Regions:
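Phosphate/NTP-binding elements of NTP-utilizing enzymes
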Residues: 1-201
């Protein structure tokens, strides 16, 4: 089916809320860092299947990835996988980056949680009580977090949206299975509209 017309930056400007504790909490505005717009919007351009970003530290890569997750979960539900260098880093990212976004961005809170104010965001217990820090279900899709050194996680199920963070710090091989990005990318082959984002510093 055709993708909804809303781009990632349009979605973020309309819905995303930056949590307290960040440098600029409150409503997201892409205009604060205009260079992020083209990167985000590439994820919803027809015909683009891989977005590669090599950048300086602290330029908003995490927010770009979070906006991609939020936009797809809300408007175009899909199986989404985020890979961090290790499982421990994936757990930390889920607790410190994903959980606050789900808590503070209303449309995502409504998707991922059922009883407002009763969620345990630290352990990310969500819609059905069976979700975990590394696996979150929402209507029509799932967000999976895994480490680059975990072949079982990387090859577990088909995904349409793949986000790989700090690729330069990935394990050289996922067990005996080979390159982690190649292994995860094979999960996308059944989707004509798949897209992968590879980020490194």
């Amino acid at each position: 089916k055709p993708l909804p017309k809303t781009s990632v930056s349009e979605w973020a400007d309309e819905y995303r809320v930056i949590s307290q504790g960040n440098a600029e909490p409150g409503r997201w505005r892409t205009s604060r860092a205009e260079y992020q717009r083209e990167i985000m919007n590439a994820f919803t351009q027809t015909g683009i299947h891989r977005v590669v970003v090599k950048s300086a530290a602290q330029i908003g890569k995490s927010d770009i990835m979070n906006n991609v997750i939020g936009r797809f979960a809300h408007l175009d539900p899909a199986a989404i996988m985020m890979i961090q260098p290790t499982i421990e880093m994936a757990q930390d990212y889920s607790k410190t980056r994903i959980a606050p976004m789900l808590r503070d961005t209303k449309v995502l809170n409504n998707l991922f949680f059922t009883v407002k104010g009763k969620e345990d965001f630290g352990t990310a217990k969500t819609r059905d009580g069976n979700n975990t820090i590394l696996s979150k279900i929402f209507p029509g899709g799932r967000l999976i977090m895994c480490g680059s050194n975990s072949p079982a996680g990387l090859a577990s199920r088909p995904v349409r949206v793949l986000l790989a963070d700090e690729v330069d710090r990935f394990a050289q091989t996922a067990g005996t299975e080979g390159d982690p990005v190649d292994l995860a990318s094979k999960r996308m082959t059944t989707f004509w509209n798949h897209v992968a984002g590879l980020f490194s510093t």
